[in-house]
Amino acid sequence: LASSAASDVYKRQAEHWKGQTGQGVEVIQSHGGSGKQALEVANGNEADVVTLALEYDVKAIQDAGLIEDGWINEFDKDSSPYTSTIVFLVRKGNPKNIKDWGDLVKDGVGVITPNPKTSGGARWNYLAAWAYADKLYNGDETQIEAFIKKLYENVLVLDSGARGATTSFVENNQGDVLIAWENEAFLSVQENPDEYEIVTPSISILAQPSVAVVDDVVDQRGTRDVATEYLSYLYSDEAQRIAGDNFYRPSNPDILNEYADTFDLNINLVTIQDFGGWDEVQKKHFDDGGVFDRIYELSLIHISEPTRRTPI
């Protein structure tokens, strides 16, 4: 969850826990790129619970021996209490007339998106763009890769996480379009309604953040009960509405329908299973030497102004 939503949930859950047990709860939060956060936890930065951008990042902590097998079935909806999707945030009036993914590869369009090597949200961005190109070119991977390469040639800043990318676009005034989590885009418009607007592409992806108890840590600290209760609380009607109020899509379909005036519920969404699941996606696209590395290296070669690109 973004920090604003997380703080609200933690406060409500702490009140709920104290009412049930009489115990107070102190919550220490860490926010950043999902892949980077997962690596830090796997390398010993203790966390009782994780809420990460994608299943694969939780599996990285599992592979380090800190989360037990079967975590994805511990909570409802494959341990995904809320979802999101990928949209475009553009400047007010949409001066570059950006309407779909195809507009992001046009000359003169500056794109902001995070680095999929470090950001879970950026992987969703990449896959949503791939889904568009896959449909456009009827699965011809040579043409799909050429499309993705052109898109990354237009990327001005490759931040390590989604929040950093938003900062580059909003605060640093870089780029014409931010490929963004839907919730981040809505928050930017809410905070600056006269400066930005949202464009929903013709096709996107169902982004499913994952939550898990870090078993090794909670067993050592004796915090399993409160950690499990916190993640269970995310599925309560109250927490689902907090998620919706912060522009995440509640996993409870009845509560999601309460936000029909906020979200485009008819958007064409592919899922990670359309790509064969995260293991296959990671190996093909994001592992060292994968498709993204090849495309990004080629896109760097074709940049005429080296100072345009600022990988972070």
Residue ranges and their predicted role:
Residues 1-10, 305-307, 312:
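Short, small-residue-biased leader/transition segments that mark boundaries at the very start
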Residues 3-4, 90-92, 109-137, 152-155, ...:
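Short beta-strand->loop
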Residues 3-118:
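N-terminal segment of the mature folded domain
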Residues 14-22, 42-46, 55, 62-66, ...:
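Sec-exported extracytoplasmic/periplasmic mature domains
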Residues 80-85, 145-152, 158-160, 191-224, ...:
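Periplasmic-binding protein-like
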Residues 93-99, 118, 131-139, 217-225:
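Short helix-loop capping/hinge motifs at secondary-structure junctions, enriched
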Residues 136-202:
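Ligand-binding pocket segment of bilobal, Venus flytrap-like solute-binding proteins
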Residues 218-300, 304:
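Extracellular/periplasmic juxtamembrane helices and adjacent flexible linkers that interface
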